[in-house]
Amino acid sequence: MPSLRDIRNRIGSVRSTRQITKAMKMVSAAKLRRAQDAVLKTRPYAVLLDQTLSRLAARAAAEEQVAHPLLAPRAQRTAEVVVVTSDRGLAGGFNSNICRFVQRFLTENADRFERIALSTVGKKGREYFKARRLDIRKDYTGVHANLAYEKAEALAREATERYLAGEVDAVFLAYNEFKSAISQKQVVVQLLPIDTSAAGADATGIDFKYEPSREALLAELLPRHVAMQVWRALLESAASEHGARMSAMESATKNAEEMIASLSLQYNRARQAYVTKELMEIVGGAEALK
């Protein structure tokens, strides 16, 4: 049976842990509000840009007048999956959920591609797939620190360069899509080549006017579209991470409080037993002196 000192030390240790988890919860809550605002502001622009470019590209493809390399289909033998995770842990199942989701994607598409490589954004993704000896083409760390659109542009540019150089025939983007503070959805979307199939039927009935030209518009907007999809994924992942960490720290704080209550009860019972024992010894000694 643990001594009173051991129980008291344990209570002090758990209280210190509770202070840490409570502080982390408050910090994550503040970061979540900012990240959520950024996601909600970016989503409409990203969706509208995607729809507009998809219609424009589908119309161009239907008229067979423009063949942009980011739109042109090709035999898909090799693929790359860019997996967005975090640099830090203590976020519940945030990282493990997306990593397992990507593993299922790799298994399901093993027959579709001769080779699938990975690029990881965040230390946790790199550690997860490296431990399983999977092919990691490139890893990016520190992206989430001072998250900026320029970082998304750099990621998109490197992925586009590998695609245009023929190193890969398709690029996919995997990340946690933000739903709420307690809910995230794991998604894998095709980044390259840009898929216009969903807008094909609607686009053929639209009469577009191009200034200065269709080729110039596609050359300018398609790379921007790729960068915007990466930027949206980074923002969605950041909001999901803060929400997951806030929930995990809230749960940890509640568990710590329950443990403190249990240990305090154990301490009081042990102290009561100790006092009772002392009283019995005093009474026994007094009886012996009679």
Swiss-Prot record:
Q: Which GO terms describe its cellular component?
A: plasma membrane; proton-transporting ATP synthase complex
InterPro entries tied to this protein: ATP_synth_F1_ATPase_gsu, ATP_synth_F1_gsu, ATP_synth_F1_gsu_CS
Q: Which GO terms describe its biological process?
A: proton motive force-driven plasma membrane ATP synthesis
Output the Gene Ontology terms for molecular function.
Answer: ATP binding; proton-transporting ATP synthase activity, rotational mechanism
Any idea what job this protein has? Produces ATP from ADP in the presence of a proton gradient across the membrane. The gamma chain is believed to be important in regulating ATPase activity and the flow of protons through the CF(0) complex.
What's the protein's topology in the membrane?
Answer: Peripheral membrane protein
| Record-given protein name | ATP synthase gamma chain
PROSITE patterns tied to this protein: ATPASE_GAMMA
SUPFAM superfamilies named in the record = ATP synthase (F1-ATPase), gamma subunit
Assembly, per entry: F-type ATPases have 2 components, CF(1) - the catalytic core - and CF(0) - the membrane proton channel. CF(1) has five subunits: alpha(3), beta(3), gamma(1), delta(1), epsilon(1). CF(0) has three main subunits: a, b and c.
Q: Which domain of life is it from?
A: Bacteria
What gene is it encoded by?
atpG
The alphabetical list of record keywords is:
ATP synthesis, Cell inner membrane, Cell membrane, CF(1), Hydrogen ion transport, Ion transport, Membrane, Transport
Query: Which is one Pfam family of this protein?
Result: ATP-synt
List where in the cell it is found: Cell inner membrane
Q: What family does this chain come from, according to its entry?
A: Belongs to the ATPase gamma chain family.
